[in-house]
Amino acid sequence: MAVSDGWTLALDTAGALTVVGALAPHDGPATERVGEPEARPGRRGGTVHRPRHAEQLLALADDALTATGGAWDRLARVVVGLGPGGFTGIRVAVATGRALALARGATVVGAPTPLAVGPAVGVPRLVVQDARRKELFLTVVAGDDPTAPDPVPWAVPVDGLAAALDGLTVRPTVAVGDAAADHAVTLRAAGIAVPDDPAVHRVDGVALARMGAVRPAADAGAVRPVYVRDADAIRTADR
């Protein structure tokens, strides 16, 4: 089915939230659905938030399609957030997107997750994500041209954030992302605003769908996660 005649479905599971966006054809209705992680007591006190991507993703997708007047047999394109983020989490969206595209005869498109974080705040913006292991993922989104090359994220130690900001060649005016608020003091000291609205710090499912609707399609096997660093085992206590 041509993209112009069918629905676009966006999936992102790179972070703690499960985010889905649905976009009807011909500038029709668009909506998103967001699944929250499960809160559990931590072994060393506090609360641990366990993502529920595998449990939530397809149900949220079905709900979003239905809400926009769509159905699975009208699916034309699947857009998956490629990360960076949690290794296991990213793979849920990528694997599900590939499978849906194959089963439904739809095209599949990948897009870096940071492009869909905080688009409402404009550009240039800095996306700051929790990379665990006492590190952060940083991505500078310099523009909103869908035909421009994708920004390249990189990892920095938490205690190296100030130095990383000093070395930026493109100066962002605002920072968003799931770790931006935690490092607001450092960011603001560098002249970078950090919004108080929590909604701008997460993936926007509708923005991801709209972005994916105009990106070139790819073979399912060519849609691969953006991990930034190698996946290897590490104790939870050291993350």
What are these model-predicted stretches?
Residues 77-108:
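DPxDG-like acidic metal-binding loop motif
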Residues 57, 61-64, 68, 114, ...:
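Generic hydrophobic alpha-helical segments
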Residues 68-73, 168-171, 215:
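Glycine-rich phosphate-binding loop signature in dinucleotide/nucleotide-binding domains
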Residues 197-214:
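Short, flexible loop segments at boundaries between secondary-structure elements
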Residues 2-80, 84:
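N-terminal beta-alpha supersecondary unit
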